[in-house]
Amino acid sequence: QAFLKRYDGQAVASTFRSVWLPAVARRQDWSTLLANWAPTENVGLRCAQLTARQATGKADAQWTSEAQDLWRKAGKSLPDGCDAVFAVLQTQGGMTDALRWERVDAAADAGQPSVMRSAARGLPAADLALATDYASFVDAPSAKALNWPRNERSRRIATDGLQKLAKANPDATEQQLPQYAQALGLSADQQAQV
């Protein structure tokens, strides 16, 4: 801590903090972590800070908002250290269906079908089935999509899946695009994205 105070504001302090705070989190020394916290883009450290706040009785409305923000913006898999944060968020009623869908959408945009499936757990059965279909399509487009609801989310997922297919097999994508465009009402812009 003395090192951080001595070199506060310098790059060396930031580098030291990014190495030292994960060790503090592994020891579950929450008060030390919170006392030496500085905002960071490191998702693992952000989850550790949220865990520290929750463990010290500071899981307030701001905590909920920050945990939800971390969840919704993560289109890719998150560190295991975030699992406890999201479990508490679920227990406190902060993990809404709309929030789950936001992460499903972000994961689709990132081309991460496994994250889509994981984010969808906890949705009502019909929504879970649709989200699973969406994830399967992003993984490998199929004709099942022709029966999806004709809404913006379906169009977005179809565009994401077809973009991925276009990288691997442009000819197949070119042949299949018209049927998806017609069935789901893809706009000219969405078709051009593919």
Enumerate the language-model features and the residues they cover:
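Alpha-helical solenoid repeat scaffolds
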Residues: 1-194
